C-alpha cells in the first residue's frame, strides 16, 4: 500500500499497535520493531538507551519521542481503527503528524500519518557526534546529547519536571539485592493498587515518562489534567 503511495527507496514506517514485534518484517515494511537471536547487540542497546522497549533479543516501537522518530526516519505512522483484534499495545498519533492516505480491509481501517520531521537516511553532522557516550538509565538525557552533538548546540530539548506530590494506595515496597525497588500489593484481596504522581508542566508541552527495570512486568499508566483531577468530573485517560 505505502510503496505505491510513496515509492521512495528508503524510509521507515511504524505502527501505533502491535500484534508481534516482527510486524514490520512480516508485512513488508522497514521499522524499528524486530526480534531475532542474530540481531546486532550494540544496535539493540543503543535503541534501548534512547528509550525504546527492549528485551534481550528484541526491540519494539514503544517509548518513542518526536526526537527518535526524526532521528530514525520514521516517515509514516500507521494507525488502525474499527476492528482492533490482535492489537496488544497502542501509541498515540501526535497532532503534528497529518493523515496522508488510508485504506479499508473488512471492518478495519488503516490510516497513515506523515511525520514532517523525519530526517532521512543520512544527514550532515557536527564531528562531536563521535564522542557521545550514552548513559544506562536516562533516555531523555541521551537524546539531548545526541541532538546537541548532531546540531552543534547546547539546548535542553527535554527538561526534567519535579513530582509535586505522590501517594500510594495498597502498595508496599522492598529493596532487592541489586538495588532495584520491588512494588507489590499490600493486600492481594483488594483489586485497587496504584501510585499517584502530581506534576506541573506547560499545558502545550508533551509529557514523557520512563520506568527502567530489569524485571519486565505489565504496568498501566493513566493521566488526567488538573481541572478534571480536582473536581473528578472526567475519568482518567489510559496512556498505555
Describe each PLM feature range.
Residues 1-239:
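Soluble catalytic regions of membrane-associated enzymes that act on cell-envelope
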Amino acid at each position: 500500500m505505502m510503496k505505491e503511495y510513496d515509492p521512495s527507496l528508503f524510509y521507515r514506517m511504524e505502527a501505533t499497535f502491535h500484534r508481534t514485534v516482527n510486524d514490520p518484517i512480516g508485512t513488508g515494511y522497514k521499522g524499528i520493531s524486530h526480534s531475532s537471536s542474530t540481531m546486532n547487540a550494540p544496535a539493540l542497546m543503543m535503541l534501548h538507551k534512547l528509550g525504546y522497549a527492549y528485551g534481550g533479543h528484541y526491540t519494539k516501537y514503544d517509548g518513542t519521542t518526536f526526537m527518535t522518530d526524526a532521528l530514525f526516519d520514521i516517515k509514516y505512522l500507521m494507525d488502525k481503527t474499527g476492528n482492533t483484534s490482535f492489537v496488544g499495545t497502542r501509541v498515540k498519533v501526535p497532532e503534528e503528524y497529518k493523515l496522508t492516505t488510508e485504506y479499508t480491509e473488512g471492518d478495519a481501517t488503516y490510516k497513515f500519518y506523515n511525520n514532517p520531521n523525519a530526517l532521512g537516511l543520512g544527514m550532515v553532522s557536527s564531528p562531536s557526534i563521535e564522542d557521545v557516550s550514552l548513559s544506562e538509565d536516562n533516555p531523555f538525557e541521551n537524546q539531548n546529547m545526541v541532538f546537541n552533538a548532531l546540531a552543534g548546540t547546547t539546548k535542553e530539548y527535554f527538561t526534567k519536571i519535579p513530582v509535586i506530590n505522590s501517594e500510594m494506595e495498597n502498595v508496599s515496597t522492598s529493596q532487592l539485592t541489586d538495588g532495584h525497588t520491588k512494588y507489590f500489593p499490600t493486600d492481594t484481596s483488594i483489586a485497587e493498587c496504584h501510585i499517584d504522581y502530581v506534576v506541573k508542566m506547560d499545558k502545550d508541552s508533551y509529557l514523557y515518562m520512563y520506568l527502567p527495570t530489569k524485571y519486565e512486568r505489565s504496568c498501566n499508566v493513566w493521566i488526567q489534567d488538573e481541572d478534571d483531577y480536582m473536581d473528578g468530573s472526567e475519568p482518567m485517560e489510559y496512556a498505555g
